[in-house]
Regions:
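An acidic, charge-biased composition feature
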Residues: 21-242
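Bulky hydrophobic/aromatic packing residues
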Residues: 1-3, 19, 109
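Bacterial N-terminal signal peptides
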Residues: 13-23
Length: 242
């Protein structure tokens, strides 16, 4: 491998790693009210026409002087998002998951999807009625779950949840890329969770699943993901900014 090839690979690894870290901790504005938003009372006949982006934000308990419990987002993915997606995938045009953890904003796992208000209402109802969600709220492991008001479409454009600093073509096409990454992650969660079928303790189970995800990412992410993403873009060097 030539020095220039090595530099290009190192540059790619650093910039993609930086982007992953930044996107994982980017600010997602939570609902300002201290109480969870309630499901809109309107029926399918009274909801507006059209499609837009919708958020379900799961606020995870994070006591002071304690480590971030990343496995809780993985638990929500496997026990809440996966069954909801399997049931209502026809309502979802495009979607992704998102994580953030900062002391000013808290630890939040988000399910973000593009759908009609009617589809959003069905999905929100399924989340609200999910037994694991109820259990996590009752135990205090989830402090609240915030949802959007389905009577108003506030993010109708496909680029409305992309970073406004990006070029327009990137804003409009990035959701497809991150959906693929999210689907791969969710399927990996399901695969690893199936191997822990004998474990009834969900917290213990998803700690193991998260450890497995970390091992796979660290061992195979460079070639399975970063190398092939670089290949799609013709192995060109990247401009790096911090």
């Amino acid at each position: 491998m030539s020095k220039s090839d090595f530099s290009s690979r190192c540059g790619l690894l650093l910039i993609v790693t930086a982007l992953l870290v930044l996107s994982g901790f980017a600010a997602v504005t939570p609902v300002e009210d201290d109480k969870p938003a309630s499901l809109a009372p309107g029926t399918a006949g009274t909801l507006p026409d059209g499609e837009g982006w919708w958020y379900a934000r799961f606020h995870i308990d994070w006591p002071e002087d304690s480590q971030i419990r990343w496995h809780m987002g993985t638990l929500i993915g496997g026990e809440v998002i996966a069954p909801v997606f399997d049931e209502y995938y026809q309502d979802i045009y495009i979607w992704r998951v998102h994580r953030r953890a900062s002391r000013d904003g808290g630890h939040i796992f988000s399910f973000i999807f593009y759908s009609t208000p009617q589809g959003a209402q069905r999905i929100y109802t399924a989340i609200q009625n999910n037994g694991v969600v109820k259990s996590l709220l009752d135990s205090g492991q989830l402090t609240r779950v915030d949802i959007d008001d389905v009577t108003r479409i506030t993010r109708p454009n496909i680029e409305d949840t992309s970073d406004a600093r990006w070029a327009e073509p990137v804003q409009k096409t990035w959701p497809a890329m991150i959906m693929g990454a999210s689907r791969m992650w969710l399927d990996m969660v399901s695969e690893l969770a199936a191997e822990e079928y004998a474990t009834s303790d969900l917290d213990k189970k998803y700690r193991k699943v998260q450890d497995g995800l970390t091992d796979l990412w660290q061992d195979q992410g460079q070639h399975a993901m970063l190398h092939h993403l670089n290949a799609v873009y013709a192995y060109q060097p990247l401009l790096m900014r911090y």
